[in-house]
Amino acid sequence: MMADYQSSNYQKYKNPNPVQHWLIVRFYTAILELLVKINYGSLLDAGCGEGLSIQKIMSENHDFHIYGMDLSLPAIKLAKNLHNQLIFIQGNVLNLPFKDKSFELVICLEVLEHLERPEQGLSELLRVSGGFILLSVPNEPYFRIANLLRGKNLSRWGNDSGHIQHWSANGFITYISHQTRVIAWRGSFPWIIVLCQNHL
């Protein structure tokens, strides 16, 4: 039986609105287009929420080890309920509970914009990655424009209350290039998705 808990993230991905659904489909299509460029046998989704991204990736790939981690205990409980064949743990992206180079691929979707020190989070993602990381963040100002167009967060000019960092596509690529090597990226309105290789 599904838990009563549903985060705003879960509601966003399950929203029946056709435009919202179309944007989410495009988002995951772009992610899968990037992932076909690499080989990996183990995956960590850091900031996995309820495991919906893992579910999308699993639909295309089956033969690898998957871990999901999130700060929210209710989200982890729901993820375990929805995907009981996978491993989900509670943890903080700023202090990942894994050894160095534990995973061939680490994904972190829509997390870094919530961090006061995103460089610390990125360092941890790189530490536990033995190969690649896949990141996504809102592409500003398009994310806020999209919110305004649908009447969301009007008093904050479209900005989500939890978003501390605001990057354009070029700004984000420049920012992460100080710590990792960008292989490829995709713009999927209103997000940017970047595939990087751990060169540390």
Task: Name what the model sees in each region.
Residues G68, H114, L135:
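Conserved SAM-binding loop
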Residues M1-K99, L122, L149-L200:
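Conserved N-terminal segment of class I S-adenosyl-L-methionine
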Residues G41, E104, G131:
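Conserved acidic residues
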Residues N139-F143:
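Short "lid" loop at the C-terminus of a central beta-strand within the Rossmann-like core
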Residues G130-P138:
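Conserved beta-strand signature within the Rossmann-like core of class I S-adenosyl-L-methionine
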Residues I107:
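A conserved beta-strand element that flanks and buttresses the S-adenosyl-L-methionine
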Residues V111:
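Hydrophobic adenine-recognition pocket in adenosine-nucleotide-binding enzymes
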Residues L115-E124:
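A short, conserved alpha-helix within the catalytic core of class I
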